[in-house]
């Protein structure tokens, strides 16, 4: 008999949901069924799937099929699938994975586990959904996976169709393109591939994630989201299918709002489909639309909802990681040169601040102190940074430590800095110092008014880039981690001015709640992109608990 909450929730529970999880544990213990199959579309590196597959130590759900177009993100997805297969079916061989992570082996598998590596490649597929070949492969894989399960046993579809065209930033960019036509942008309609899978295979439940910009996006004067709701509620009608199929109720995870076939979407408060991640123990202000679709024969009254949690700050999440310095780009880099160049840059700013207006003048002694301390951090990190005493990685939250930390790792994965120009490093050091005093980032040219701080942008004083240099405030959840972090670090400046840098991939991954043993593959830019596009796994884990309870 299981009598420990950790047998259901393998990490210490979030403070506000202990009672809920205990009830859920009892419900799940009443069945001895096999793990519920999951099909994960547009999977990226696997954040949404990680949350589901880790529930109840991997016995509640099992990823049967995952699909990702990007070959580098697919490498990460496959590696994680391999880890799960080792964990669930051959735990005595987990050492193969850790030897690879710790830099003791070139490959994650040995001759004894190569079969699981190949199996992981069949589960995690690199295909383009929507293409003829991609759809044929996907359909064959889904059919094979679903045929293995006992008749009438449930299965779940998860995923988030690519969202660039929906995002507010993406739409602003498209407005600058005179030839852009929303109706011709295939990214608007990739959700119909998701819809096709719903219509063909009728999952008991689906979870669909997207940016909140989807709520206001329009094509030819019609709100896209209204059409999406109607399509998802009745996939057969949407796709003009001849056979009669199931309909779905589209449920909010944070309110009692439900959309059903025949309802008028204009009468809905669409914001009730937005999940604010920071309200649920995620150290990041990430606001996303997440739809829970429940097949009409599975629908029930009084559906469970996500439970609000205590806030987790940036410092909580990343403060326990090793301190690092940035790299000098476009010039020679060394510890001595970095200390000299950055120290001098901050000293110059300190002297200028001493004669500035009151808001900035206050910073002068703090900039002086930062300049004097700049040489105390002289490590730039590594893809595999050896663990040393003094950096425990702990967060101050037991449940988060049990979710993130892994004692089998001898290294910090993906924790390395990138290069920045010396003038940008001056801006980073200044902005982080400003934030340490005012608990906010400096805004625009009026608070970046010292010599050398203004970037060479013609419209710098227009107000368009008022938050171009944004510090992640240590005592607050971070701002949204996005794929833009792969381009530059200006929006993701570390709160410690002495480190004078942008966030590493591992720090961004922690703010997204990826476990420390989640090894992102590819070059650093590609790693950032994967992390920024993902669903926070710990949020997905809580959603998985809701789904498990509905299907229990």
Give the label of every model feature segment:
Residues 10-13, 17-25:
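Short, positively charged and aromatic/hydrophobic N-terminal segments
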Residues 519-552:
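TerminUS-proximal long segments
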Residues 35-38, 64, 154, 270-272, ...:
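Extracellular structured ligand-interaction cores
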Residues 407-510, 515-522, 526-528:
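Polybasic, glycine- and aromatic-enriched phosphate-binding surface used to engage nucleic acids
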Residues 168-452:
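Class I S-adenosyl-L-methionine
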Residues 30-39, 43, 47-201, 212-226, ...:
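Core alpha/beta nucleotide-donor-binding catalytic domains of modification enzymes
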Residues 4-8:
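Intrinsic-disorder-associated, low-complexity terminal segments enriched in Asp/Asn/His/Tyr and depleted
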């Amino acid at each position: 008999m299981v009598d420990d909450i950790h047998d259901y929730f393998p990490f210490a529970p979030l403070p506000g949901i202990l009672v809920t999880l205990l009830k859920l544990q009892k419900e799940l213990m009443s069945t001895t069924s096999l793990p519920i199959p999951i099909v994960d579309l547009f999977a990226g590196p696997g954040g949404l799937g990680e949350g589901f597959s880790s529930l109840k130590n991997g016995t509640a759900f099992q990823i049967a099929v995952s699909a990702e177009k990007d070959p580098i993100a697919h490498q990460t997805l496959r590696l994680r699938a391999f880890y799960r297969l080792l964990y669930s079916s051959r735990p005595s061989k987990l050492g193969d994975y850790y030897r690879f992570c710790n830099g003791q082996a070139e490959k994650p598998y040995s001759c004894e586990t190569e079969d699981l590596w190949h199996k992981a490649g069949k589960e995690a597929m690199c295909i383009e959904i929507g293409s003829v070949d991609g759809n044929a492969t996907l359909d064959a894989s889904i059919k094979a996976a679903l045929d293995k399960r006992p008749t009438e046993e449930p299965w779940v579809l998860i995923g988030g169709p690519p969202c660039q065209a929906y995002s507010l930033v993406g739409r602003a960019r498209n407005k600058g393109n005179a030839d852009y036509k929303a109706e011709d942008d295939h990214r608007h309609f990739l959700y119909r591939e998701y819809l096709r899978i719903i219509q063909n295979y009728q999952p008991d439940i689906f979870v669909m994630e997207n940016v909140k910009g989807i709520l206001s996006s329009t094509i030819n004067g019609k709100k896209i989201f209204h059409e999406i709701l109607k399509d998802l509620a009745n996939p057969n009608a949407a796709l003009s299918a001849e056979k009669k199929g199931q309909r779905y109720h589209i449920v909010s995870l944070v309110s009692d709002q439900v959309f059903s076939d025949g309802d008028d979407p204009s009468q809905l408060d669409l914001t009730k489909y937005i999940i604010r991640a920071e309200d649920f123990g995620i150290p990041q202000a990430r606001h996303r639309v997440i739809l829970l679709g429940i097949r009409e024969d599975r629908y029930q009254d009084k559906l469970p909802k996500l439970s609000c949690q205590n806030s987790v700050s940036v410092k909580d999440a990343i403060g326990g990681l090793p301190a690092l310095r940035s790299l000098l780009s476009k010039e020679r880099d060394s510890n001595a040169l970095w200390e000299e160049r950055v120290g001098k840059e901050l000293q110059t700013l300190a002297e200028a601040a001493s004669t500035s207006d009151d808001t900035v003048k206050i910073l002068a002694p703090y900039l002086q102190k930062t300049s004097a301390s700049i040489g105390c951090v002289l490590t730039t990190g590594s893809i595999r940074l050896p663990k040393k005493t003094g950096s425990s990685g702990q967060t101050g939250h037991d449940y988060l430590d049990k979710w993130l930390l892994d004692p089998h790792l001898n290294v910090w994965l993906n924790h390395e800095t990138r290069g920045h120009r010396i003038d940008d490093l001056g801006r980073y050091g200044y902005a982080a110092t400003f934030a340490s005093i005012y608990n906010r980032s400096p805004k625009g040219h009026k608070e970046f008014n010292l010599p050398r701080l203004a970037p060479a942008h013609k419209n710098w004083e227009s107000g368009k880039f008022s938050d171009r240099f944004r510090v992640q405030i240590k005592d607050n959840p971070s701002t949204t981690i996005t794929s833009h972090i792969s381009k530059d670090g200006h929006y993701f400046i570390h709160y410690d001015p002495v480190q004078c840098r942008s966030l590493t991939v591992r720090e961004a991954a922690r703010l997204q709640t990826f476990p420390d043993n989640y090894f992102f593959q590819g070059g650093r830019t590609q790693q950032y992109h994967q992390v920024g596009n993902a669903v926070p796994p710990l949020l997905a884990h809580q959603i998985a608990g809701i789904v498990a309870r509905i299907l229990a």
